[in-house]
C-alpha cells in the first residue's frame, strides 16, 4: 500500500475519491482514508519489482493506469519515469494522486497507447514494464514490436499477460468475451508467447512467475462500480470462466533487446 500521512478534511477528500470511481489499481492510503481498489496491485508488484535494477535507468510503464507502479518505482531511484495510458479517468486519478505520492513531480504521464511508442519514443528506454496490456491488443505482434523499438539496445522488457496452460504452440482467441471482457483477443501458451517475442527480436526470454488470479488479488470493493472476478467465473466451477474457458492465469516474463539482430 502507498501511504500519505498528510492531514486533510476527511469528508471532502472521500467525496473527491468516490467521484473518481472505479479505482482498479491500488491500494492507497491518504491521511486516514484507504482507497481499497479492485486489484491488490502489491501482489503483482512483488512479483516484478526485482526483475531488473531501476536505479539511474530511464523507465516506462506502458498501460500505467493511475500510476500505482510508477509511484512504487520512485523508491528505486530511476533517472526518469514515463507512464503511458490513453484512458481519461485513470489520468484524472493520477493527477489526484500525484501531489501526494510524487511531490517532486518526477513522473511524466503520457495519454498514449502502446501503438504510439515507436514513433514518439524510439530507442528511448532502458526498461519497459508492460503489465496487463498484451491480451487487449488485436495484434499482439505489433504491440511487442512497438515495445521492442521503444527500448534502447540492451534494454529490458518486463511483461505480464494472460496465458493458457498448454505445452502446445496454441493461443486462445475467445469467440465473444473472456471473463465478461469484450476486449480480450489472444491468450497464448508460454511457448507461443516466447515465439512471438523472439519473432520481433527479443532474446533471453525468462519466466519470472506464473500465478492464478484469485479473489485475494481481484475483488469487489466500495471503490469500484459493478462486478469483479467472482462474478466472471462459473459459480459451480470457479476453475472456469462464465464462457467455459479456463479461469485467468497470468505469466510474468523478462526479455532483452539484443545489441545485434
Swiss-Prot record:
Carboxy-S-adenosyl-L-methionine binds at residues 25, 39, 44, 63, 114-115, 135, 250. InterPro entries: CmoB, Mo5U34_MeTrfas-like, SAM-dependent_MTases_sf. It comes from the Bacteria. GO terms for biological process: tRNA wobble uridine modification. It holds the Pfam family Methyltransf_9. One of its GO terms (molecular function) is transferase activity, transferring alkyl or aryl (other than methyl) groups. It catalyses: carboxy-S-adenosyl-L-methionine + 5-hydroxyuridine(34) in tRNA = 5-carboxymethoxyuridine(34) in tRNA + S-adenosyl-L-homocysteine + H(+). HAMAP family: tRNA_carboxymethyltr_CmoB. Belongs to the class I-like SAM-binding methyltransferase superfamily. CmoB family. Catalyzes carboxymethyl transfer from carboxy-S-adenosyl-L-methionine (Cx-SAM) to 5-hydroxyuridine (ho5U) to form 5-carboxymethoxyuridine (cmo5U) at position 34 in tRNAs. This is tRNA U34 carboxymethyltransferase. It comes from Helicobacter pylori (strain P12).
Amino acid at each position: 500500500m502507498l501511504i500519505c500521512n498528510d492531514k486533510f478534511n476527511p469528508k471532502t477528500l472521500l467525496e473527491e475519491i468516490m467521484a473518481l470511481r472505479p479505482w482498479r489499481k491500488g491500494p492507497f492510503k491518504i491521511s486516514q482514508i484507504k482507497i481499497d481498489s479492485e486489484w491488490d496491485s502489491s501482489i503483482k508488484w512483488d512479483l516484478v519489482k526485482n526483475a531488473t535494477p531501476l536505479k539511474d535507468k530511464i523507465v516506462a510503464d506502458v498501460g500505467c493506469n493511475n500510476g500505482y507502479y510508477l509511484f512504487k518505482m520512485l523508491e528505486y531511484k530511476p533517472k526518469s519515469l514515463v507512464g503511458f495510458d490513453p484512458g481519461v479517468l485513470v489520468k484524472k486519478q493520477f493527477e489526484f494522486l500525484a501531489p501526494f505520492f510524487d511531490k517532486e513531480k518526477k513522473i511524466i504521464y503520457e495519454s498514449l497507447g502502446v501503438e504510439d511508442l515507436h514513433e514518439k519514443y524510439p530507442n528511448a528506454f532502458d526498461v519497459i514494464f508492460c503489465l496487463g496490456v498484451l491480451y487487449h491488443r488485436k495484434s499482439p505482434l505489433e504491440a511487442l514490436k512497438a515495445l521492442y523499438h521503444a527500448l534502447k539496445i540492451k534494454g529490458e522488457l518486463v511483461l505480464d499477460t494472460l496465458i493458457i496452460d498448454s505445452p502446445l504452440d496454441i493461443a486462445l482467441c475467445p469467440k465473444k468475451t473472456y471473463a465478461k471482457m469484450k476486449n480480450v483477443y489472444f491468450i497464448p501458451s508460454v511457448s507461443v508467447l516466447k515465439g512471438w517475442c523472439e519473432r520481433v527480436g527479443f532474446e533471453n526470454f525468462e519466466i519470472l512467475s506464473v500465478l492464478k488470479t484469485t479473489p485475494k488479488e481481484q475483488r469487489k470493493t466500495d471503490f469500484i462500480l459493478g462486478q469483479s472476478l467472482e462474478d466472471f467465473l462459473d459459480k459451480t466451477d470457479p476453475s472456469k470462466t462464465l464462457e467455459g474457458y479456463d479461469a485467468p492465469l497470468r505469466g510474468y516474463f523478462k526479455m532483452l533487446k539484443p545489441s545485434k539482430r
